[in-house]
Amino acid sequence: MSLILAIYGKGGIGKSTTSANLSAAMALKGAKVLQIGCDPKHDSTFPLTGHLQPTVIDVLDSVNFHLEDVSKEDVIRTGFAGVDTLESGGPPAGSGCGGYVVGETVKLLKEFGLYDKYDVIVFDVLGDVVCGGFSAPLNYADYGLIIACNDFDSIFAANRLCLAISQKSQRHKVKLAGIIANRVDYEYGGGTNLLDQFAEKVGTKVIGRVPYHDLIRRSRLAGKTLFEMEGPGKEECTRPFEEMAEYLLAQPQATVPQPYHDRAIFEAIGGWR
């Protein structure tokens, strides 16, 4: 059976860059990994492959949405460290339902029988959980992961995601494996002081601290993982992903989170320092 991870976080928080480097780190430790981008922008796997690949919705459209006419080779590409990649895609901006496409992608994966082929499957899911379609990966995941920064908007979104995971856990096996702190800045951004307090309050922990570093920005522009980059700070940037990969591959200590009510999170964060 595959270890299935669903990664969420506020829009623009760095989910795709983080997911790609985490997938690469697990692959470098010997795991066979599939990363699935669940965003109409279809750029989740760009750091792994160096290009934008055909999406599931593009391929389905070309065969008039007959699933039986689609093969694995039509939608899956292999990127850095042997990580297989797939992009669900979505409808044109301003039309259709992206959640429907996520559901169709999951259906296609089940048709292919891919859950038995991989050691790890990573769902990189867009923004906040805004509808049932985008929460679909939680129906299949062993663990949810939340990416967040040390600021109010990010923590507010993380709390909403904790609520989604808590609700899904009532009918499915999914639990929260932890929070990944991104763009950690100890000089000007408070490090992870707010995130640490939030994690403790909702019953989880910060499992990784990814620094705010220019090498990460440049890796995204280059369409590469951090492991392929050269320059100052490489070890500082790759170490958190190596540590998180070890943690996740070794059956993490997961919990069902206990999120705040929306009004309560406003009041709580205002008193944190």
UniProtKB/Swiss-Prot annotation:
Homodimer. Protochlorophyllide reductase is composed of three subunits; BchL, BchN and BchB. Belongs to the NifH/BchL/ChlL family. InterPro entries: NifH/chlL_CS, NifH/frxC, P-loop_NTPase, Protochlorophyllide_ATP-bd. The gene is bchL. Its EC number is 1.3.7.7. Keywords: 4Fe-4S, ATP-binding, Bacteriochlorophyll biosynthesis, Chlorophyll biosynthesis, Iron, Iron-sulfur, Magnesium, Metal-binding, Nucleotide-binding, Oxidoreductase, Photosynthesis. It is an enzyme of class 1 (oxidoreductase). [4Fe-4S] cluster binds at residues 97, 131. PROSITE patterns: NIFH_FRXC_1, NIFH_FRXC_2, NIFH_FRXC_3. Component of the dark-operative protochlorophyllide reductase (DPOR) that uses Mg-ATP and reduced ferredoxin to reduce ring D of protochlorophyllide (Pchlide) to form chlorophyllide a (Chlide). This reaction is light-independent. The L component serves as a unique electron donor to the NB-component of the complex, and binds Mg-ATP. The lineage of its organism: Bacteria, Bacillati, Chloroflexota, Chloroflexia, Chloroflexales. This is Light-independent protochlorophyllide reductase iron-sulfur ATP-binding protein. ATP binds at residues 12-17, 41, 182-183. Mg(2+) binds at residue 16. It comes from the Bacteria. GO terms for molecular function: 4 iron, 4 sulfur cluster binding; ATP binding; metal ion binding; oxidoreductase activity, acting on iron-sulfur proteins as donors; oxidoreductase activity, acting on the CH-CH group of donors, iron-sulfur protein as acceptor. Its cofactor is [4Fe-4S] cluster. The keyword Transmembrane helix does not apply. Binds 1 [4Fe-4S] cluster per dimer. It comes from Chloroflexus aurantiacus (strain ATCC 29366 / DSM 635 / J-10-fl). Pathway: Porphyrin-containing compound metabolism; bacteriochlorophyll biosynthesis (light-independent). GO terms for biological process: light-independent bacteriochlorophyll biosynthetic process; photosynthesis, dark reaction.
